[in-house]
Amino acid sequence: MDMRADVLIVGAGMVGSALALALQGSGLQVLLLDGSPLSVKPFDPAAAFEPRVSALSAASQRILERLGVWDGIVERRASPYGEMQVWDGSGTGQIHFSAASVHAEVLGHIVENRVVQDALLDRLHDCDLGLLASARLEQMRRSGDDWLLTLADGRKLRAPLVVAADGANSAVRRLTGTPTREWDYLHNAIVTSVRSSQPHQRTAWQRFTDTGPLAFLPLVRDGQEDWCSIVWSTTPAESERLMALDEEGFCRELERAFEGRLGTVLSADPRVCVPLRQRHAKRYVAEGLALIGDAAHVIHPLAGQGVNLGL
């Protein structure tokens, strides 16, 4: 017999999980499925930072507070910032944003995506929502007024509303033939965490260079404010050269590109290089179907705003 739900959310990432929690208490039978085990690892506050982070806005914080998730985030690790410094590498312009200018304590928080995800999963496991872990979607078609989904293990799911929250390479978007508008940015993003000789002053820094933007996003670990998450967007050829450098060579290149604003770059965690591609679904909704988060829109990581848009 087919499993049935009122709302079937495919993808338990940050946006899909947040939607599931938001629907709790609505009277709707909600089923959330994901290809991962949906397990939560014990958090080690002394552990290295995850390479992927988001700059959560005050609006996103309020959403996560209403969902009962925010405390679980700050108990793990969240780094507030109250200033932003942005400048042009050619010296022609700069801009400064301050939380004080809008009568706020902070502009936002830099948080590892894994931290947000685990805090959401903690709440999900405490709720009466239906969770299907390690469930891979294979087929999807209309069946009367419902969508009929077939999983890789042969199980069948049925729902009048399916929400695609399964990321940039959405299987739901592909299986439903939802068209997209997309193009390559012709840039790659190098992401890692680095330690500097000077504290970051709870400031988000961004320099626009001739080959692309370089961001230093403040991180706090064990009370130390000398760590930053960096996102360095540059050409494929330049990113290949930078990825080939040893740690010391990369730190020197990074220090020069950042004009030494935080002194010496002392160390860098292992780097990840991600090709950048814009992808935008031409429609977000269809009969019994909605696309959210990266399944609907993938943007440049310039300001770490993807999760904010999704929420």
Task: Give names to the regions the model predicted.
Residues V15, L38, N169:
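Conserved Rossmann-like nucleotide-cofactor binding loop
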